[in-house]
């Protein structure tokens, strides 16, 4: 199987996981990544750069695996002519709903800290399959996701959590 792995924050544990998966898998894995810096910008703009790189790449994957740092909805909308028929998996190595924030972060101080979690939610909704690395991680994402949606004044779309849950699994990639 030919797998395209998308990682916009290629450093530390993200890099170790991606390279470990690539080197230990029986599948042919092509990684498109960006340097592991400016994590907020990677979550906003990384999909645009990665989409551009993918469209220039001579690689036709059977499966696309994106990590939680990618805005999968933006990537898919920018690459639909090549990706509309390819199954997608969103892999949560971590997530921005339950990841601890620094109290000195300006987004926390200005009460804007739900935006990155919402990117994770919309990406999970857009993916065909959603994988988590532990049961705790899956459960805390679903609970936290519902809490984020309840934060909004209307059209909370709480049923989207059930849709995400129905296509979510705990999985160690091999």
Task: List the model feature ranges, each with a label.
Residues 35-37, 94-96, 136:
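Short beta-alpha junction loops
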Residues 1-38, 42-61:
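N-terminal subdomain of nucleotide-sugar transferases
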Residues 9-12, 69-73, 174:
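Short beta->alpha connector loops
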Residues 64, 82-101, 106-116, 120-125, ...:
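Active-site proximal beta-strand in glycosyltransferases
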Residues 15-16, 73-77, 100-101, 141-142:
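Short glycine-/acidic-enriched loop or helix-start segments at secondary-structure transitions
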Residues 5-7, 32, 91, 133, ...:
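Short hydrophobic segments within beta-strands
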Residues 126-167, 172:
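A short, active-site helix/loop in glycosyltransferases that binds the activated sugar's phosphate group
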Residues 2-4, 55-78, 84, 89-91, ...:
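Short N-terminal targeting/anchoring amphipathic segment
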């Amino acid at each position: 199987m030919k797998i395209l792995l998308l990682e916009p924050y290629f450093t530390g544990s993200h890099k170790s996981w991606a390279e470990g998966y690539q080197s230990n898998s029986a599948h042919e894995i092509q990684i498109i990544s960006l340097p592991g810096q400016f994590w907020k910008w990677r979550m906003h703009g990384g999909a645009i750069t990665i989409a551009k790189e993918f469209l220039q790449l001579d690689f036709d994957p059977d499966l696309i695996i994106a990590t939680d740092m990618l805005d999968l909805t933006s990537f898919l909308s920018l690459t639909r002519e090549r990706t509309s028929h390819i199954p997608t998996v969103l892999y949560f190595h971590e997530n921005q709903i339950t990841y601890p924030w620094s109290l000195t972060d300006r987004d926390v101080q200005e009460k804007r800290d739900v935006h990155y979690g919402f990117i994770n939610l919309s990406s999970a909704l857009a993916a065909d399959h959603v994988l988590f690395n532990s049961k705790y991680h899956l459960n805390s994402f679903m609970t936290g996701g519902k809490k984020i949606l309840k934060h909004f004044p209307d059209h909370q779309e709480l049923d989207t959590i059930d849709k995400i849950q129905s296509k979510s699994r705990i999985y160690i990639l091999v």
